[in-house]
Amino acid sequence: MKISVFYEHIEKACEQTKKPLEEVLEHVKKSGIDGIEMDYDMLSSEDDEQSILTSLKKARLVISSIYGFCHLDSDPEEQKCLDVIDQAAKNGCSRVLLVPGFFSEADAKIFGESADDWEKTVAFMQSNQVVQNIMAGLRRAVAHAKEKNVIVTLEDFDSTLSPCSRINALKWFMEQVPGLCWTLDAGNFAYSSENILDAYEVLRTYTAHVHCKDRG
């Protein structure tokens, strides 16, 4: 098992301790952490990318996953989701986490009312245009990622507006997009009041990555 930490948390540690980035990264490595969870937007500038990668390499740390917020809800042909994958492949990172888009308040209400029931969830997902756009975009992304030896994942996202926030919805996406995997976030089911053990029972065969989080 390999352990990683979010780069944003490293930046926060620098801010709180007033220590330079290099010293915090050295502490991270000495603590048994080998990987960094990276926001794609932090790497979108060539100068920022080079600076971050140089610091990580010096500390003997690698990027374990790159996550990116996309807009497949409105544009299944969006380029950004492919750019996230390309960035991962470029840096030897084997997985990405895509946050593919969000519902309107009205659609989120209907989604929430059906999410506890599998058959109702299936009916909603099949009829909702946002979901259909996301599904098409994810199929395209997974096909592109396969060529790059990168795994595409979704997580149980912590928002009632997210089509990926409920167990049944995640199961539906996994079944409809062959090759798609799950990043288990241990804290985000607090938003849907669903049991993480129930989620694991349903989705464990799709698990590729874990975010450990205590929201108790």
Enumerate the language-model features and the residues they cover.
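Gly/Pro-rich active-site loop or hairpin
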Residues: 11-21, 75, 163-167, 171, ...
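N-terminal pre-domain/capping segments
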Residues: 1-95, 124-132, 181
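Conserved beta-strand positions in the central sheet of alpha/beta enzyme cores
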Residues: 37, 65, 97, 153, ...
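Short, surface-exposed basic-aromatic patches at helix termini and helix-loop junctions that form
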Residues: 53-54, 174-175, 201
